Amino acid sequence: MKKLLLVLLTLTVFNTTLVAKKTKVDTTFTFQNFVPSSPDAVKEFHRTKLLGSSRIEYPSFSGNNQVVTAMNKEMDKFINDFKETKNYVYKVTYSVTGNNAYFVSVLFNVERKNKTTNETLTYNEAISFNAKSGKALLMKDIFVQNYESALNAAVNDRVKQFGITTLDEKKRKFEGVDKKQKFYMEDDAIVFIFNQDEATDFGDKQLFIPFILTDLIGLLK
């Protein structure tokens, strides 16, 4: 009888372990039940890397091993785009604009210097991460299917509110947001980035279009 109970207990433990291994945590990104004030998902550490004569400041992350490993890998790949080339050298700084239980977002300020003319172009790049998986977030990850028309209508309305004249030339026409749109997120907002020759000739020719997340209910996942 004791042997039988031992066998049954062993089988129960084995089956429980097997079920646990088969059960995967859903890491799909969603804003459902989103709490902007939720605790930071990761800890951020300032890093500086020299790639040739390019100087790149960027964050590395610590926390959940599996998640931060993915984030740091994505970040290394991202900053590699700023390595010195035959024609250009880069100076890059950053700020972490959002860090909560749902996402981590980083905004980069980039100065690209032409090594021949010494002319400097300043622009912005950004990368955001799913705090559950560590994967970089794209537009398709945060917006529902077929979001483009409704979102661009909201973007155009916001541009009109700002009173900004957008590019309307054949080769330089403002087309609104697209699938590869640059953006960064704050804990309660998303900001779309348009660098020079992408949206306007006004001021420094860069355009940032912000939306409070609650303004986009119905479009966000």
Language-model features and meaning:
Residues A20-K221:
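Compositionally biased intrinsically disordered regions enriched in Thr/Gly
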Residues V13-V19:
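C-terminal segment of classical bacterial N-terminal signal peptides
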